């Protein structure tokens, strides 16, 4: 497969677990400057093989471009991990085409901006991993407005996707992976489309995430 399976599943799992809290939050779609009319299954690749979705091009379009597309109700968190620091965020509510949901994302790493943010933000200790995280206040978001978006993950909140829906919109997946923890199935299934840069995740609670990353 041309897509790094480990990368897309790792990012998807982080966003998927973290996103569960978003489903219970009240929805209020903010004013959007440049709303995308593309449904979540319409994607393409640029000449450089970067994912194009919702009018954005990953690794090129910036956080500011994403704000213009998805609205300004955005939150950023900086995570310290074994593989290095990572800035992740989400739009609590947005609309793409006729669909309403949350939009999670990661940014291309910029060590200088991340170091500045860590100096000014208050760290929190992750209970399980022991790693530090920094929930960035709105005034620190400006540090990252020009940073390119690395990945996106759309979390629809008003529709239920089935395996047949996934295959009908994206085609037959190259691989289907059942997520396991401690050798036990979690009920979460990944439908991988490496040539498209797409990972569709369905869980046993009928929740779904469509993740987009450049192949």
Please state what every model-predicted region is.
Residues 9-27:
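Hydrophobic membrane-insertion alpha-helices, especially the h-region
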Residues 26-47:
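Ser/Thr/Pro/Gly-rich low-complexity linker/stalk segments immediately outside membranes or between
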Residues 42-54, 142-151:
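Acidic/histidine-rich, surface-exposed loop or edge segments in extracytoplasmic proteins
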Residues 1-6:
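Positively charged n-region of N-terminal signal peptides that target proteins for export
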Residues 32-34, 61-215:
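A cross-family detector of function-defining hotspots
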Residues 21-23, 45-47, 153-159:
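Short low-complexity stretches enriched in small and charged residues
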Residues 53-61:
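Short, contiguous acidic and Ser/Thr-rich linear segments
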């Amino acid at each position: 497969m041309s897509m790094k399976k480990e990368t897309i599943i790792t990012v998807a799992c982080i966003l998927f677990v973290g996103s569960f809290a978003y489903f219970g939050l009240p929805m209020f779609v903010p004013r959007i400057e440049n709303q995308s009319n593309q449904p979540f299954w319409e994607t393409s690749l640029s000449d450089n093989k970067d994912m194009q979705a919702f009018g954005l091009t990953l690794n090129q379009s910036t956080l500011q471009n994403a704000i213009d597309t998805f609205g300004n109700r955005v939150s950023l968190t900086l995570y310290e991990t074994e593989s290095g620091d990572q800035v992740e965020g989400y739009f609590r509510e947005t609309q793409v085409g006729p669909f309403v949901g949350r939009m999670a994302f990661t940014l291309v790493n910029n060590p200088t901006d991340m170091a500045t943010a860590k100096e000014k933000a208050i760290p929190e200790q992750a209970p399980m991993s022991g790693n530090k995280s920094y929930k960035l206040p709105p005034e620190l978001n400006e540090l990252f407005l020009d940073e390119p978006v690395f990945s996106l993950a759309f979390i629809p909140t008003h529709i239920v996707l089935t395996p047949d829906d996934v295959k009908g919109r994206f085609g037959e997946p190259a691989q289907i992976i059942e997520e396991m923890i401690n050798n036990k199935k979690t009920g979460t299934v990944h439908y991988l489309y490496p040539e498209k840069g797409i990972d569709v995740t369905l869980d046993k609670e009928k929740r779904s995430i469509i993740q987009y990353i450049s192949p």
